[in-house]
């Protein structure tokens, strides 16, 4: 899944976005738009 490279999501727009709920969704996901791009921890 996402974050297998363990780098901040903001570095990989083509990988995933980190939602506040802790869900890591694909940046191309139109179901969960507007997710934050902060570091996923």
From Swiss-Prot:
Q: Where in the cell is it found?
A: Secreted
Q: Does the keyword Ribonucleoprotein apply?
A: no
Q: What keywords sit in the KW lines?
A: Disulfide bond, Hydroxylation, Ion channel impairing toxin, Neurotoxin, Secreted, Toxin, Voltage-gated sodium channel impairing toxin
Q: Which InterPro entries match?
A: Conotoxin-I_CS (IPR013141), Toxin_19 (IPR012624)
* A Pfam family: Toxin_19
Which tissues carry this protein? Answer: Expressed by the venom duct.
ATP-binding: is it a keyword of this entry?
no
Query: What does this protein do, in the record's words?
Result: Iota-conotoxins bind to voltage-gated sodium channels (Nav) and act as agonists by shifting the voltage-dependence of activation to more hyperpolarized levels. Both natural (L-Thr form) and synthetic (D-Thr form) peptides cause paralysis and death following intracranial injection and grooming and hypersensitivity upon intraperitoneal injection into mice. The L-Thr form of the peptide is 7-fold more potent than the D-Thr form. Both natural peptide (L-Thr form) and synthetic peptide (D-Thr form) are active on nerve, and on muscle.
Name of the protein described by the UniProt record: Iota-conotoxin-like r11d
Q: Which organism was this protein described from? A: Conus radiatus
